[in-house]
């Protein structure tokens, strides 16, 4: 049924009311904004309506109208391009956002980030309605509580959009999703629209960088801090100074970097960037397992953390000393081989050792977690020896990047349906091996059903969630270069001796 013009006007009114109520739009700019939107919707007249719609329903109605009128195809990608364009008209200009952020920063860094985070949600860059679909829980493991999420906020691609994207030639502008040229970019079928993106300029160690929020918000105030230049990821001594340069300006945030090698690195290695935010991860809560001292660095507290991945924690009031020691650890690790522990610095000229660093301020002191990583592949483990092993791929087979390293699993959306179906199949006593969708979970389900004779309709979901948590702990154990065993700790101490000897 075709939408009436009155409904479109009402949806338009609702969108403008929303923008005024959350401070995106100044009342003096309302008529200007309405006329801009009317022009975009190819409407030549307007009458005020009584009918009211909430946000984002009003925005969805305007997309419905555009699709009915043939302005856009009714696909997720085309609707996203269109609704982002509309929100772009209502989002304050970059200079206004920067001015407001800096004004609030004089009150406190937190006041500034609160403003910027709320703006990024209000202007629909972060789509609250999609983020709300993500499933989250915590699971108790032998390493303490780990955090689990099933990522449902990234919509599945429409086959029509995939087909259209194949026909579109890449323009090479912007070079990637992290380049500052994305601000205000209209987007294409294969590159998201960014008219409502705002990036805060920040100085990081004397260089111009940008600071924005991730549209997917895997955790509270999930931000991305990226070099203003399109330059590749590199983990070197300078990275530690850069991380602290940012967290000193925003001491309520942590900031970490993905590693700079494939398999153990992030998904974008072509543009230097860090990820941070206002969230306390399981790794940060993990306690000291044992301390160690490094001669010449008496003012740096060093310990190994009780955690499935290999974490060296450095804490000091002297940032320069701490970063110097981190630089030494990185240099030693890059060059370190211990064949007995299956650690090779390189094979056939390909380097394997790197680090995932995470910086934070803790009670006024500088703290740096160095997670030792290695991307060696073997015949038995072609995707990576220190990567989720094949028997865990039914839950998680993707790379273990910074967010997972810190103790938050980002699991694929397919698991929501698979786990609901698994619950029903187990309660009905079905043979999982005869079920095409669920057969990959059969060995795992057999094992945990043996541990849970109490499994019933009331507790089934809680047991499955708990057991997913145990799988995630195993995933992190796989990614840990030194295992939490006697032989693993002995091998780790051999490396620490290397560090201590300078």
Give the role of each language-model region.
Residues 1-225, 229-232, 306-308, 322-326, ...:
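Active-site microenvironments that recognize anionic phosphate/pyrophosphate groups
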Residues 165, 271-272:
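Short secondary-structure boundary/capping segments
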Residues 196-198, 228-255:
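Helical scaffold of the NTase/Pol beta-like nucleotidyltransferase catalytic core
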Residues 238, 247-270, 276-330, 334-337:
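Catalytic or ion-translocation cores adjacent to nucleophile or general acid/base/metal-coordination motifs
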